[in-house]
């Protein structure tokens, strides 16, 4: 095959499609490495920092190669960007008739069967839901793909979606009467026929878990090459899919679906209603037994509580009775057969959870206002991923802007079971020394001090003023975010956007539109967000992002590492925090023309021995501890923006 390098350096291909396009050496180096991995069937990890052009560096060799390729992303937004923007451009530049397809998880597609099943039911409790059903029904008649992302007038969390999309629990598969017009099945068929399929990590690991279960099922086509973008997310996503989850919402949906399906059979509806009522009561009592507060906690914290265990056993017994009732009805219809299967699976899952004795797993739960979610999560996924890799003798390419810690890949290699992977680290071509200033403020108390957030927020007011708003203020806890929000409401005049008061997409759209806003966010705003230009000129990080000691999975991993002779702080907590800080800091400079200020306020950065690892992991920006330097820097940028000559003092900022 013709080399990717020769195509990327051919200006007649890309320059007409990308104004100002010039091949970059880091991009070419990555393309060479990806091409070698594809040819050899090897495993390659590439850390490609912002600005290296990694998307073209893997898409070009992937499209030039023979055989099908899967490209997996961490987020649906990147998935859509690759399919609708990047791939059409690369295909046009290469002039290759490659077939490409987009495949998402089943919850992203309309289910015609469930739409018809629920459309005429009078169990929609609110006017909002009725109106949403009408919108969906109208759209269903004209959509080609059935991808619910098309219907932008409904939010992602609209209450109608569970009624008109399927889950692995309730999908009837080939037995569904709507199988021929099923958008999900049509998307899978297109994927089977494509040369390159864009998926996401959740779908990839759902498929891997199915294949590993020995069930003889698969969601994705086989591939010669798998490319993971945003690969730093793989360990946590893999852990979720190689574990087990059961929620009271799933159990309640089983009851509702059983009742809907039973209307088309000769089932004893009175008895079924009684059994479903018992299950509903069991779900409610189980939720109440865990206390009013919403929380995440290890099961070991409550498994000796008699009331909790009794409520769990009562729910299990109610589920067993429903399972026994549904068993004979499975022959009545495909829908009832699916409900019967789900009931048996829920019984097995809840029984195993209440037993809670599987080794190398952490059993934990989450409580929400009306729901309990039970989780059984593996402490490590390295063995499963190693087995997955060995079962599939194809090329694996893993890339992200943040894979290494201190320039070394051992941490991510060990977590993924890919110790022998080849590695390549490519630094950003941006001139951070000229584009950005790093500010570590003086005089703050230790982060454990109750006054820390208040004093930090007060110190950041003049920084925000100097930046003219245009700030991401990133927090490691919701409590600190709420405290800072209350202070800033009375201290700044810029638009204040606070996570939790609107959806993530709405907040980001508003931030871009206003041009001088201050956005306060926690973990979901630390990565996967790309705000270029003048709307974002300052990123403030309140603390070094060590994982919460109250997180049950992290706590169990820490205990496991220490119990087996390791050093959990050095081997797990510190590397994870470094990678998280690099992600947060990466929100600032997204473009060669971007400029701005990065604030890492945590005094441990300079007072603790491990602080150097954090500092050295960040881009080499101009560093200061003085507020007046920060103010001169922003004054300098403002004059530049208006075409004025900066003062001598500002030029020295």
Regions found by a protein language model. Name each.
Residues 35-36, 55-68, 85-89:
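Walker A/P-loop NTP-binding motif
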Residues 162-197, 208-217, 321-444, 451-458, ...:
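A contiguous, basic/glycine-rich beta-loop/short-helix subdomain that forms a polymer-engagement track
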Residues 476-500:
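Conserved helicase motor "Helicase C" RecA-like lobe of SF1/SF2 P-loop NTPases
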């Amino acid at each position: 095959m013709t080399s990717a390098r020769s195509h990327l350096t051919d200006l007649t291909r890309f320059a007409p499609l990308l104004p100002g396009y010039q091949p970059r050496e880091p991009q070419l180096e990555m393309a060479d490495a990806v091409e070698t991995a594809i040819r050899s069937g090897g495993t390659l990890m590439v850390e490609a920092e912002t600005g290296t052009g990694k998307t073209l560096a893997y898409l070009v060799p992937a499209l030039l190669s023979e055989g099908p390729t899967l490209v997996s992303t961490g987020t649906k937004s990147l998935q859509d960007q690759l399919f609708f923007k990047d791939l059409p451009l690369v295909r046009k530049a290469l002039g290759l008739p490659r077939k490409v397809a987009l495949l998402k998880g089943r919850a992203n597609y309309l289910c015609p069967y469930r739409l018809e099943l629920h459309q005429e039911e009078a169990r929609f409790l609110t006017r909002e839901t009725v109106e949403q059903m009408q919108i969906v029904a109208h759209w269903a008649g004209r959509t080609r793909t059935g991808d619910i992302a098309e219907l932008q007038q409904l939010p992602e969390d609209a209450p109608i979606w569970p009624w008109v999309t399927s889950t692995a629990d309730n999908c009837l598969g080939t037995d569904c009467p709507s199988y021929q017009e099923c958008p999900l099945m049509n998307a899978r068929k297109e994927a089977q026929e494509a040369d390159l399929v864009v998926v996401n990590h959740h779908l990839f690991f759902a498929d891997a878990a199915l294949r590993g279960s020995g069930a003889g099922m698969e969601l994705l086509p086989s591939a010669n090459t798998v490319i993971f973008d945003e690969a730093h997310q793989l360990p946590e996503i893999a852990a979720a899919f190689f574990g087990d989850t059961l929620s009271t919402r799933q159990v309640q949906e089983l009851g509702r679906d059983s009742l809907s399906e039973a209307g088309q059979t000769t089932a004893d509806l009175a008895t079924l209603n009684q059994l479903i009522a018992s299950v509903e009561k069991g779900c409610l009592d189980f939720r109440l037994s865990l206390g009013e507060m919403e929380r995440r906690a290890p099961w070991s914290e409550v498994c000796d509580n008699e009331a909790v265990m009794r409520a769990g056993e009562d729910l299990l017994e109610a589920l067993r009775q429903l399972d026994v009732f549904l068993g004979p009805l499975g022959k009545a219809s495909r829908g009832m057969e699916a409900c019967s299967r789900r009931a048996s699976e829920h019984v097995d899952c809840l029984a195993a959870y209440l037993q809670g004795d599987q080794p190398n797993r952490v059993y934990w739960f989450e409580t929400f206002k009306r729901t309990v979610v039970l989780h059984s999560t593996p402490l490590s996924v390295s063995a499963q991923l190693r087995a997955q890799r060995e079962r599939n003798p194809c090329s694996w390419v893993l890339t992200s802007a943040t894979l290494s810690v201190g320039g070394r890949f051992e941490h991510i290699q060990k977590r993924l079971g890919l110790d022998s992977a080849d590695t390549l680290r490519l630094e950003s071509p941006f001139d951070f020394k000229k584009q950005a200033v790093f500010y570590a403020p003086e005089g703050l108390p230790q982060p454990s001090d109750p006054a820390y957030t208040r004093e930090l927020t007060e110190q950041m007011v003049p920084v925000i003023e100097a930046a003219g708003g245009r700030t991401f203020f990133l927090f490691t806890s919701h409590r600190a975010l709420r405290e800072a929000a209350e202070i800033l409401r009375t201290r700044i005049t810029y638009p204040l956007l606070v996570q939790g008061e609107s959806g993530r997409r709405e907040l980001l759209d508003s931030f871009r539109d206003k041009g001088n806003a201050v956005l306060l966010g926690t973990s979901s705003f630390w990565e996967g967000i790309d705000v270029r230009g003048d709307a974002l000129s300052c990123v403030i990080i309140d603390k070094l992002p060590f994982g919460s000691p109250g997180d049950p999975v992290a706590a169990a991993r820490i205990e496991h590492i220490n119990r087996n002779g390791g050093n959990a702080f050095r081997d797990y907590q510190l590397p994870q925090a470094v990678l998280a800080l690099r992600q947060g800091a990466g929100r600032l400079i997204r473009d060669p023309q971007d400029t701005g200020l990065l604030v890492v306020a945590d005094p441990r950065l300079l007072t603790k021995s491990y602080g150097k690892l954090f500092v050295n992991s960040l881009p080499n920006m101009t560093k200061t501890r003085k507020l007046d330097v920060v103010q001169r820097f922003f004054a300098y940028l403002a004059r530049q923006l208006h075409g004025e000559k900066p003062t001598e003092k500002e030029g020295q900022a």
